[in-house]
Design a protein with these regions (language model features):
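A short beta-loop-alpha structural element at the N-terminal edge
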Residues: 2-16, 27
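A short helix-loop-beta-strand connector motif used in the catalytic cores of GNAT acetyltransferases and
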Residues: 44-59
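Conserved GNAT acetyl-CoA-binding A-motif
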Residues: 111, 118-130
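Conserved GNAT-fold acetyl-CoA-binding loop/helix
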Residues: 22-46
Length: 155
């Protein structure tokens, strides 16, 4: 088992995992196989951009050359505030382990590495908007509920 940051060589596996994750999590969404090419193009562009800037970090668990789990972290740089040093925070999303690798503690091991990495880089905190099914997982890994954010849905 290898826990590491993803790179451009991982793009095809990451695209497939994102596709599978969406199909699994939203079975009623009526996504067609014919949608894959357009999705692939958009996701590939996103990943190439993510690997070429310092705003996204994609962590993976790899076993025998196959990525079996991933977590995406977007770095959010805050506006400086007088009287204190301003540190960034992380937004965690796209947390996914393939079905046949679940229940092995891989997600928790990945989360442990990410938390150590974020502490070393002086991140102030990491936020995640969990689904109902994932709340226990995040709780086991040190996350607590905070006040609900507000949103303005624009589209």
């Amino acid at each position: 088992m290898n826990i590491r940051l993803a790179g451009t060589k991982d793009i095809e596996q990451l695209i497939k995992m994102r596709w599978d994750f969406t199909l699994e999590d939203y079975p009623d969404k009526k996504i067609q196989d014919s949608d894959y090419n357009q999705f692939h193009e958009e996701c590939e562009s996103f990943l190439l951009n993510a690997f070429n800037n310092n705003h996204w970090y994609i962590w993976v668990v790899e076993i025998e050359g196959k990525i079996v789990s991933n977590i995406y972290i977007e770095v959010i740089h805050k506006v400086p505030r007088p009287g204190r040093i301003t540190y960034p925070f992380g937004y965690m999303t796209n947390v996914y382990t393939i079905p046949e690798s679940r229940g092995l503690g891989l997600g928790s091991k990945l989360m442990t590495e990410i938390n150590k990495w974020a502490e070393e880089l002086n991140y102030e905190f990491i936020i995640v908007w969990p689904s109902e099914q994932s709340i226990d997982f995040y709780s086991r890994n040190g996350y607590i509920h905070c006040k609900e954010p507000m949103e303005n849905t624009l589209s």
